[in-house]
């Protein structure tokens, strides 16, 4: 949870804890610049995370902007994920936990070399208005390489096989990082 350990263009898996050390949520934090970070919580906990961060920062000059309604996340995971990403014109040659942001003809895109499956993977943060376009393009190219869509159930199976924790399962406000094996 120490952003001083990463530099702009890097992501970090972090735990947002309450005053008692319980895990409010596990999040990815993207350091876009020294004065700009992007926090991606689990969708089910977005309002709780935003409320917690706003409460903690209320007496500071830090501005919190909730983009959960205007942003969509599409994950592309698996051995051919880099080929799929590059086939739609996005950069795929990224080291793990690195990301780039770009403006495209189809809106702003953050391409992150992250994922929650144990496979090589990417997560795209796209403008919600362009999500259908990106989904369609990614799906066509993934299917051409033998890939197919899968939902959170598939992701949950893969993350369980890898031993990755998930809030609401191995993590909760009554479980601290040490108890979860994430210290």
Regions found by a protein language model. Give the residues of each.
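Basic, glycine/lysine-rich polyanion-binding surfaces/domains
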Residues: 1-183
């Amino acid at each position: 949870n120490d952003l001083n350990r990463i530099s702009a263009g890097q992501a970090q898996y972090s735990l947002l804890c309450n005053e008692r050390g319980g895990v409010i949520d596990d999040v990815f934090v993207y350091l876009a610049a020294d004065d700009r970070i992007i926090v991606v919580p689990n969708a089910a906990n977005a309002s709780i995370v935003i409320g917690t961060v706003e409460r903690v920062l209320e007496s500071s000059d830090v501005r919190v902007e909730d983009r959960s309604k205007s942003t969509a996340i599409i994950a592309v995971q698996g051995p051919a994920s880099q080929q799929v990403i590059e086939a739609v014109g996005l950069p795929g040659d990224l080291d793990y936990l690195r990301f780039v942001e770009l403006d495209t003809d189809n809106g702003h895109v953050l391409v992150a070399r992250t994922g929650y499956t144990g496979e090589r993977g990417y997560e795209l943060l796209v403008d919600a208005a362009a999500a259908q376009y990106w989904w369609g393009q990614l799906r066509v190219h993934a299917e051409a390489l033998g890939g197919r869509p899968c939902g959170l159930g598939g992701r949950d199976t893969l993350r369980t096989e890898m031993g990755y924790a998930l809030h609401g399962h191995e993590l909760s406000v009554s479980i601290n990082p040490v108890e979860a094996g994430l210290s």
